Amino acid sequence: MGLAPLHRRQLVLAGLALLGALVPGGTGAAAPPAATAEEVVRRLVDQVWRMLAEGEVENVDREHLLAVVDEGADLSLLGRLVLGRYWRQANPRQRTEYLRLFRHYIFQTFVQRLRQYVGSDLGYVSERFQIIASRQVGERDVLVQSRVAPPTGQPVRVDWRLREGQDEPVIIDLIVEGISLLVTQRSEFGAVLERGGIDGLLSELRVRVTQPA
């Protein structure tokens, strides 16, 4: 399921254009305070890190981890943004199933990223994860920039895009080494949607979420 990989520069430019378009002008909600956004990221990483430190990445309780991620990330908003114009075309049944499957698909992606960049030897979060800086992006969002140190090799740059939620800021995109999760998934899903529409994407996702991460 997916398109041929885009070049990194293309993905970065596409991400900037897409995310900029998602921020309307005028009197929308203000961007969250940078310190609050950093605390949300730090708390989420710490919780997930401690869960993973207790066992193998593959054996982590899926629903427990999803519940933790749900506290810090707006997966429903991310899912709608990924679907783009097709969200308006989907009927209520398709929307409900899509969001349910999308949560689990993101879990699979999350575990794959962890395996790739973190490995099995987690160590202490304070030794492997560092928030570098944060800055406002557009009128409504804050970008928290961080660095993750893998067991071997160079540190990995991980940026978190947050927007004000109901009670506190929520994560709406994850950008690893300049590659936006939102933009990447929108490109991959778009290819499937062009071929088979909403039902075609749902069929693909049903298969994907039953496969080992």
Predicted feature locations:
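Early exported N-terminus immediately downstream of N-terminal targeting peptides
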Residues: 34-114
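Compositionally biased, proline/threonine/alanine/serine-rich low-complexity intrinsically disordered stretches
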Residues: 29-36, 50, 203, 207-213
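Low-complexity, intrinsically disordered terminal/linker segments enriched in charged
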Residues: 173-213
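C-terminal segment of N-terminal export signals and the immediately downstream linker at the start
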Residues: 4-9, 23-44
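Juxtamembrane/interface motifs at transmembrane-helix termini
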Residues: 80, 115-121, 191-193
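Surface-exposed, charged secondary-structure patches
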Residues: 100-102, 108-156, 211-213
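Short beta-strand edge/turn micro-motifs at domain boundaries
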Residues: 155-183
